[in-house]
């Protein structure tokens, strides 16, 4: 469980912090990227909470 939480934290944390280089052809995907960034922040936060809770049981 802790290992899975670490993987989720790293992957979705990097995704949440990443910047997308959007060209004119990709502007229709901006809403999807914004939504994914918000989801990624929540997933990373939950994973961090699981890790924190697991370390201090």
UniProtKB/Swiss-Prot annotation:
One of its GO terms (cellular component) is plasma membrane. It is a multi-pass membrane protein. It comes from the Bacteria. The keyword Membrane applies. Its main location: membrane. It is found in: Cell membrane. Keywords: Cell membrane, Membrane, Transmembrane, Transmembrane helix. The chain crosses the membrane at residues 2-22, 32-52. This is SPbeta prophage-derived uncharacterized membrane protein YotH. It comes from Bacillus subtilis (strain 168). The gene is yotH.
């Amino acid at each position: 469980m802790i290992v899975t939480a670490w993987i989720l934290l790293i992957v979705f944390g990097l995704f949440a912090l990443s910047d997308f280089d959007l060209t004119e052809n990709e502007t229709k995907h901006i809403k999807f990227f914004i939504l994914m960034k918000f989801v990624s922040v929540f997933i990373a936060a939950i994973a961090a909470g699981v890790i924190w809770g697991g370390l201090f049981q």
